Amino acid sequence: MDIRIDDLNGPEIIELIGEHLQGMSLNSPIESIHALNLTQLKSKEITFWSAWEENELLGCGALKEINSSHGEVKSMRTSSLHLRKGVAKEILQHIIEEAQRRGYRLLSLETGSMDAFEPARKLYAIFGFDYCGPFSDYQEDPYSVFMKKAL
């Protein structure tokens, strides 16, 4: 698996981000969706990666810098054709390693509280993320859970 920085201009990644946003809208009320669109993902504080096997897109993930010691996991998504193949594990490990390389002391994330997000919550727990309260600009929301990992 080749995980590389992505400029978000290729048709495959545009389609996957569209699938990601559509999935969020099916499982969460609009006011509780914190997924970023393509324009937002291109902001300077976000590094975005895509995972490939030869010419096939497997998944994606991003790291947002909140401040010099705190990062946020964003836009974790596995292609529906590659679920349960370890793609998300590889991408999350890559993000954690990059956060450590940058010297972050804390890595946080927001994900959904509904059943559809249970696999994501389990993955984050396996990687040592613990439940916490809202961070950065987030507010309490019954459709969101917040997790953090000390690095």
Residue ranges and their predicted role:
Residues 3-70, 74, 79, 92-93, ...:
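Acetyl-CoA-dependent GNAT
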Residues 17, 73, 107-109, 117, ...:
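Generic structural signal for conserved hydrophobic packing positions in ordered secondary structure
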Residues 46, 142-146:
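Short hydrophobic/aromatic beta-strand or adjacent loop that forms the aromatic wall/cage
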Residues 78, 84-97, 122, 126:
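Conserved acetyl-CoA-binding loop-helix of GNAT-fold acetyltransferases
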Residues 99-112:
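Conserved GNAT acetyl-CoA-binding A-motif
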Residues 109-120, 138-142:
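Conserved beta-strand-loop-alpha-helix junction that forms the acyl-donor binding cleft
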